[in-house]
Amino acid sequence: MKQRRKKLRVIPGFGLSLGITVAILSFIVIIPLCSLVVFSAHLSPAEFIQTVTSPRVLASYKVSFLTALTASLINAVMGLIVAWVLVRYEFPGKRILDGMIEVPFALPTAVAGIALTHMTVDTSVIGGFFHHTFGIDIAYTRTGITLALVFIGIPFVVRSVQPVLEKLDGQFEEAASILGATRGYTFRHVIFPEILPALIAGFTMAFARSLGEYGSVVFIAGNTPYETEITPLLIMSKLQEFDYASATSIALVMLAAAFLILLINAVLQSRSSKIISGIE
């Protein structure tokens, strides 16, 4: 048994590599998360509950969650369409379009926020068109927040679904077509079940990123308490007031929400994979 266990450790320096990995993860992830708990411990349980459930904080939760959810649903649809076009069609400028998907990753979020704000204010061409034609204001409203979150979240869906579409075997689609299945039926019953786990993963990552987004939203949100104030901005306001205990308490709630989202994502992906495999 001892010899067998030794053979399993095929990577040279396994102990050292594992130690370095744990140290890096502790420095980057575990220690900062523990610091949130330590700072929030300065409040009593009653003070903690009062802080994280105050009307202004609850209103910021509502704005953050609703706009993040709306943007992520839009990204799920748009991201699937963009990934489908990039994989299934050939057209001039395809590589340029494919590369532009990465722009939200590379572009500083503050730059994105400023650009979106200038593009959607009532004095701009686009913002003025929606304002005067439809009576819709984009900048400094929840619509503007959603637009910013769509911008920063769509690459997560596209890059999650695109590799799966590229690896799909076209023989199944051909067989369905030969058997008389329509394109819509083939997509719903052949293609969509295969890409569903990737779509769920992309949606969840976009939602988690949108929930904590600050830089691109702060300029276009308007930041009006109870209306367009997002939770990350409220946390920043508490820090500027040197109210570190309240800031970390609110951040701890957002952290718990993020972990819950990741847990739900793992469960949904597992169930989707089992359904596709015919286990359930």
Model segments located where?
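Membrane-water interface segments at the C-terminal ends of transmembrane alpha-helices
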Residues: 9-44, 53-166, 190-215, 219, ...
